């Protein structure tokens, strides 16, 4: 009888241990699932941006874009990525192998961290932090360190010059960008991305920060283009001057990482324009009766979440037409012109905009 009781207790303990183990596995999977969904969404978003840029560029230049890889050439970016994956990874003979290898990873990871605070709905955000927007600025400022490490580790004068240019450009335009974000935080009384979007939803379309901060919006666009190193601000990798800048010695998947980092940065900058200035996930139709008739802003559940994601992405990809068309419209600036624009024009303008915003907030109390 004693043996049977002991056996029953042992079986109960084993069953409890298995249940605890299954619970831990379930919690781990549930924690990783949103991250996997976000990574998948980011990957698809980058592929769509590459395809859009090629199609729009072809249209501007009056030529036929990619058309063989998949319908309408939509799989061309995937084909290029697969090709880079199987290319040989070459290392510079006299370079610093450690810095050369870790540079691209730092650039990509620092940009990816910013996606954690992008809200696609009031409850659809991985990390709703009170310092949300400033966390993005902090982690994005790490990327130029990776570029500088890549340029220095390549032991190539063109690569090193490209890394130095990337660092100088980032420092010059990070400050106006931060001042614009600070102005938005003052208007919304919060630095949380969710709170900033909800503050814009009170008055619909006319409540967007685009109308309350037009100067900050323009400065933010110019600064974000410079941070993404898009034309006319692509001096760190100017082909005519530096071959390919800090990317000169790279090949294979490491070169592909720089390529991906460029489009990741472009996508997250456009997402932040949507969140900070264009009302985020809110539909914000100018005519109030339409939103009330369809009850679009009041829908909860899966359908409401889907609508929020769709609206955020629609605003983001519509805004992407600006940096894509700018690439084939404006000529590249000289280095002195780029630095003068950042320090002598954008910095005073963004500082004045911040002072005006602070004054208006004080007088409205």
Curated annotation (Swiss-Prot):
UniProt-listed Enzyme Commission number(s): 7.1.1.-
Compartments it resides in: Plastid, Chloroplast thylakoid membrane
Membrane topology: Multi-pass membrane protein
Membrane-spanning segments: 32-52, 98-118, 129-149, 257-279, 302-322, 338-358
GO terms for MF: NADH dehydrogenase activity; oxidoreductase activity, acting on NAD(P)H, quinone or similar compound as acceptor; quinone binding
Entry superkingdom: Eukaryota
CC terms in the record's Gene Ontology section: chloroplast thylakoid membrane
Keyword entries, A-Z: Chloroplast, Membrane, NAD, NADP, Plastid, Plastoquinone, Quinone, Thylakoid, Translocase, Transmembrane, Transmembrane helix
PROSITE patterns attached to this UniProt entry: COMPLEX1_ND1_1 (PS00667), COMPLEX1_ND1_2 (PS00668)
Chief location of this protein within or outside the cell: plastid
BP terms from Gene Ontology: aerobic respiration; photosynthesis, light reaction
Catalytic activity: a plastoquinone + NADH + (n+1) H(+)(in) = a plastoquinol + NAD(+) + n H(+)(out); a plastoquinone + NADPH + (n+1) H(+)(in) = a plastoquinol + NADP(+) + n H(+)(out)
InterPro entries: NADH_UbQ_OxRdtase_su1/FPO, NADH_UbQ_OxRdtase_su1_CS
Role according to the record: NDH shuttles electrons from NAD(P)H:plastoquinone, via FMN and iron-sulfur (Fe-S) centers, to quinones in the photosynthetic chain and possibly in a chloroplast respiratory chain. The immediate electron acceptor for the enzyme in this species is believed to be plastoquinone. Couples the redox reaction to proton translocation, and thus conserves the redox energy in a proton gradient.
Family: Belongs to the complex I subunit 1 family.
Subunit structure: NDH is composed of at least 16 different subunits, 5 of which are encoded in the nucleus.
UniProt-recorded name of the protein: NAD(P)H-quinone oxidoreductase subunit 1, chloroplastic
Organism: Spinacia oleracea
